[in-house]
Regions:
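Active/ligand-binding-proximal structured segments within catalytic/core domains
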Residues: 1-42
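Ordered, soluble secondary-structure elements with a strong preference for glycine-centered loop motifs
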Residues: 4-9, 46-54, 149-153, 222-229
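Divalent metal-coordination and catalytic microenvironments
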Residues: 12, 40, 113, 140, ...
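Generic non-transmembrane alpha-helical segments
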Residues: 17-24, 55, 59, 63, ...
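Active-site phosphate-binding and catalytic loops of NTP-dependent enzymes
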Residues: 24-29, 68-69, 203
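Terminal appendage regions of diverse proteins
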Residues: 25, 35, 119-236
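Gly/Ser/Thr-rich helix-start
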Residues: 31, 114, 146
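Non-catalytic interaction/regulatory segments
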Residues: 36, 42-133
């Protein structure tokens, strides 16, 4: 229950952070909660950049550390709309003449879900993945509280394992991976060059014989399928 509450309150905080970073036009297109992770679909006119995602994460955690009270009250729909506007309706319009209003700082939504009593209870927020799911909608996957800690520990384990495998420090991983990838591409080109040379050598050794007035080339060669196609094409 606590994990779900942290993730639910986390969607409100991340949406507010997205508004601060990207602009007030940001609107929630949907969300999904679980105990391990949660996701928030955001309406935005263009792709969110990695730098913007980083800033959203910083702002979200700042709002958590401010320990803002989560205020919940019930108001008539008319009064709530007059006070807060239609931005109340994030992810859908709830039915009924009265609305349950959830407010965390400047973020105010009509919401019937369970929440933490303050943003500080959410704990750390870690944005895990960004996905462009359709035109105008970006999906942010995140973890909050102990789930965020577990996600960060998992990421750290992957980094440590990768660094140990390549025998480098973690901060040198990007450069090392790029170097290995460049070397792999160069070696692949060299292999292709040598295969072409082998095909040329095999071709130079072929001799034809006449069978019923037709020249036929028969030879068993130990080459790859690609090289065999090259040789056959040259003979033809």
């Amino acid at each position: 229950r606590w994990a779900l509450m942290r993730h639910h309150s986390g969607t409100h905080v991340i949406l507010r952070a997205a508004k601060e970073v990207l602009g007030p036009h940001i609107h929630q297109a949907g969300s999904q909660l679980s105990t391990d992770t949660a996701r928030l679909d955001i309406r935005h006119y263009t792709h969110i950049t990695p730098e913007q995602l980083k800033q959203i994460e910083i702002v979200a955690n700042r709002l958590v550390m401010e320990n803002l009270p989560v205020m919940i009250k019930v108001e008539s729909r008319t009064k709530a709309e007059q006070k807060f506007g239609f931005a109340l309706y994030q992810g859908g319009v709830p039915p009924g003449k009265e609305l349950r209003i959830v407010q965390m700082g400047a973020e105010v939504q009509a919401c019937a879900g369970t929440h933490c009593q303050s943003t500080g209870e959410i704990g750390p927020i870690k944005l895990l993945r960004l996905e462009h799911i359709q035109d105008g909608v970006e999906r942010v996957e995140f973890a909050a509280g102990f789930a965020a800690l577990e996600a960060m520990q998992h990421i750290q384990t992957l980094l440590n394992t990768s660094a140990d495998t390549l025998s480098v420090q973690i901060e040198n991983l990007p450069a090392s991976v790029e170097r290995f990838f460049t070397e792999w591409k160069d070696q692949r080109k060299e292999i292709e060059r040598l295969r072409a040379k082998i095909a040329d050598l095999e071709l130079s050794r072929l001799e034809g014989v006449m069978v019923n007035g037709t020249e036929v080339v028969i030879k068993q060669v130990d080459v790859s399928r690609k090289e065999l196609v090259t040789v056959a094409g040259a003979v033809a």
